[in-house]
């Protein structure tokens, strides 16, 4: 004979001393729902509360100095070039310690991830987070993943390694870009080593950040603006141009294609959206 057990449909509340350790206590007692929907009201797009920017340019063009002018900055620095900026910084580099005859290495990528963990807690007074340089972080991520996968290059495990490195890097950068700070700035060097062929057949030099194309396109989708910094006749320029030659632009409706590399003038760009 088949026995069918009827499952209860009602689960009456049974308050006890263990309720204090339950993550659903407020929901059970007060009806608080953490997944509440936003108010059905259009947002004011002119009220910008967070800026995300990706700057790139040749060395000594003024990228780091410009980023240093943003309020309450913290630099996550990979190349050690912090002599002429006064922002507090975290050096992102391998840490090597020796215990007896054993050498222990902590990868730079692990240092960066720990910094992101701390920044997520918001137990600080920083308003601007600066990554200088982004391509160095990508290389650090590669080296860390080589160690994790037991390989010396992505081609050693071509079916998985490329994707694993890219996913590890982009998912961590996305965590950084989602942090609740007023300004998040990424800095890269400029790459002019590749030529492209225009529709007319002419070959020209592409101007873009020094980062893998697939990764660069993903990063561009995480920021408001991709801007190039260059020096023109002793004047430093911040360019938002984007065409088949120059990598740049963004999701903002910018009135000016170029401005002087000046913090106050850049602030006006957001005010004039």
Task: Tell me what each language-model feature is.
Residues 133-217:
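P-loop NTPase motor core
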Residues 178, 191-273:
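Conserved GTP-binding G-domain of TRAFAC-class P-loop NTPases and closely related GTPase folds
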């Amino acid at each position: 004979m088949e026995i069918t057990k009827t499952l209860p449909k009602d689960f009456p509340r049974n308050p006890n001393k263990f309720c204090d350790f339950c993550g659903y206590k407020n929901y059970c007692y007060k009806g608080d729902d953490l997944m509440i929907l936003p108010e059905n009201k259009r947002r004011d797009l002119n009220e910008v509360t967070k800026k995300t920017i990706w700057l790139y340019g040749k060395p000594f063009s003024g990228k780091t100095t410009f980023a240093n002018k943003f309020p309450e900055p913290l630099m996550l620095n990979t190349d050690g070039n912090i002599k002429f900026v006064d922002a507090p910084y975290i050096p992102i580099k391998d840490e090597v310690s020796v215990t007896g005859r054993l050498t222990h290495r902590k990868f730079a990528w692990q240092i960066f991830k720990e910094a992101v963990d701390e920044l997520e807690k918001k137990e600080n007074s920083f308003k601007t987070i600066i990554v200088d340089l982004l391509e160095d972080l990508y290389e650090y991520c590669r080296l860390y993943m080589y160690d994790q996968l037991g390989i010396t290059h992505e081609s050693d495990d071509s079916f998985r390694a490329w994707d694993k490195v890219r996913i590890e890097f982009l998912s961590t950068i996305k965590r950084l870009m989602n942090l609740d700070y007023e300004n998040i700035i990424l800095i890269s060097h400029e790459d002019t080593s590749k030529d492209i062929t225009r529709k007319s057949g002419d070959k020209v030099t592409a101007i873009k950040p020094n980062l893998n194309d697939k990764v660069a396109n993903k990063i561009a989708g995480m920021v408001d603006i991709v801007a190039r910094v260059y020096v023109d006749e002793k004047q430093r320029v911040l360019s938002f141009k984007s065409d088949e030659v120059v990598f740049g632009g963004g999701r903002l409706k910018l009135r000016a294609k170029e401005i002087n590399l000046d913090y106050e003038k850049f602030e006006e760009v957001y005010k004039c959206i």
